[in-house]
Design a protein with these regions (language model features):
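Soluble FAD-dependent oxygen oxidases
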Residues: 2-490
Length: 490
């Protein structure tokens, strides 16, 4: 049993045992009458409830309740937030009740599924965290469609889908929740062939900021918004129906390393990466990972051998110091190698821009490398996108605005509790500013940073005004309001 499942069992036991406060549910008539005018009041909302009524749909936990800290903990230990209450929801009706309670008590709301938000947007200081930890079911609708609740992790999703020889184009980090990755776009090994995670969504169950429950299908305006712009902006998705795709029979990984790099060699390796990756077939994914003065280059393939891949392998075999040529392996076994750490850690990770080619970063790369080469532990990574991500049909059906860019970069830094990260985080910001000043301003919403300038355009591009209209329709009182949520028009 995974650590995540053990935590879920622990929390569920406490909830069912009645070890926390239960608050009253609200009717649909009450929903329409509620006002959010109490948002600034200082008193504890729990103290206002004169008679606690048990609800089978949602359990409310105070800071003094035993599972509160466990439920509130996000993946990033460096981005802690403490809500006034946690609403542990058992089902969609529980989410509706929790939203209505928050409106009545003037509490702002955040939504936690997997808790992997880099800036911990899945919690909120002094507000209500709608916690979906217990909503992780996977149910087959038919032979090719599957219903998945938002707190299901990618590990759990693959465990359910792969025995049926089906996949969804999504990521590889095992502890990430389906809800967050889907609503922000979602990419991984299979995206170049099948599109983003959000592109596989056929239908969702959605609870808006009044507590009203909607069944949303492809082609609707709200579905357009949820595909790339749905992370905590105007409501809660409690269930997704996905189209699945045939799982490949095998998966092959090739790895190359280059050590003790200087700037000229690093730039030459990077130019070679851009040259050959643009020719790769859709079954291939590549990542250029520069950690201090060491490069690790990853290439994966789940299709047949092909000339473009052979050419890239040959080119990097000649210029790298360490070469590991892979052979086809079992898909499930291969994916487990990329599940990564599934317990909370200290880190800073953020998008470092979308690129078209090497020329996109040519004017800034010398400055970027200067910083990476003097800061051990700072990681600069460039991943391949492209392929079917840039499908016009997918583009029309989603608000995700960056489909034409074939590369996505990111910055990463990890540290332990005893280390002071201040200097490295300053270098992190320096790189972000260099990229911005050199015109690299498009960013991936699932890799957020509070340091991004003009984040509205960075994440959503020309889709932002349309998202504001949807915000007005489904969250007119701005219940979902954090630093980088879509804002109501003034």
């Amino acid at each position: 049993m995974t650590q995540i499942n053990k935590r879920r069992d622990f929390v569920k036991l406490l909830a069912l045992a009645g070890l926390s406060l239960y608050l009253p549910a609200f009717t649909s008539d009450e929903r329409k009458k509620q006002s959010n005018s109490k948002k600034n009041k200082e008193k504890d909302p729990v103290s206002e409830i004169e008679e606690a009524i048990k609800s089978n749909n949602v359990t409310y936990l105070k800071k003094s309740d035993e599972p509160f800290d466990e439920l509130n903990q996000g993946f990033n230990l460096a981005a802690g937030k403490v809500p006034a209450l946690i609403g542990l929801c058992m089902n969609t009706q529980g989410v509706s009740e929790a939203i209505m309670f928050a409106r009545k008590e003037g509490l702002k709301v955040a939504v936690k599924s997997g808790g992997h938000s880099f800036e911990n947007f899945s919690s909120i200081d002094d507000g209500l965290q709608i916690n979906l930890s217990l909503m992780n079911e996977v149910k087959w609708v038919d032979q090719t469609a599957v219903s998945i609740q938002p707190s299901c992790t990618l590990r759990e999703m693959y465990d359910a889908l792969l025995p049926n020889n089906r996949i969804i184009p999504t990521g590889s980090c095992g502890g990430v929740g389906v809800g967050g990755i889907t609503l922000g776009g979602g990419y991984g090994f299979f995206a170049r062939k099948y599109g983003l995670t959000c592109d596989a969504v056929k239908e969702v169950t959605f609870v808006d900021a009044t507590g009203e429950i909607h069944q949303v299908k492809r082609g609707e305006e709200l579905m357009w918004a949820l595909k790339g712009g749905g992370n905590g902006n105007f409501g809660v998705v409690t269930e997704f129906t996905f189209k699945t795709h045939p799982a490949p029979e095998s998966f092959t990984r090739h790895r190359f390393k280059a050590y003790k790099l200087d700037k000229p060699r690093a730039k030459e390796l990077m130019k070679t990466y851009f040259k050959y990756t643009k020719e790769l077939p859709e079954s291939c994914f590549a990542a250029f990972v520069l950690n201090y003065k060491t490069l690790v280059l990853l290439i994966t393939n789940y299709g047949p051998k092909n000339e473009a891949l052979d050419n890239m392998i040959k080119a990097f075999s000649e210029i790298c110091d360490d070469v590991s040529i892979g052979t086809p392996k079992n898909l499930a076994e291969s994916l487990r190698n990329y599940y990564g750490i599934e317990y909370p850690i200290y880190f800073k990770n953020a998008s470092a821009g979308y690129y078209e080619n090497y020329e996109t970063i040519a004017s800034s790369i010398d400055q970027v490398l200067d910083i990476v080469f003097r800061k051990r532990g700072l990681i600069y990574q460039i991943n391949t996108l492209g392929g079917n991500i840039n499908n016009p049909e997918f583009e029309n059906e989603s608000c995700y605005p960056h489909r034409s860019s074939p590369y996505l970069s990111e910055l990463q830094y990890y540290w332990d509790e005893k280390k002071d990260p201040t200097a490295l985080l300053k270098s992190f910001d320096e790189i972000q500013n260099i990229l911005y000043e050199n015109g690299i301003r498009k960013q991936y919403r699932n890799y957020p940073s509070l340091g991004f300038k003009d984040w509205e355009r960075a994440y959503f591009g020309d889709s932002y005004e349309r998202l504001q209209e949807i915000k007005k329709a489904y969250d007119p009182e701005n219940l979902f309001d954090q630093q980088q949520t879509v804002k109501l028009k003034e």
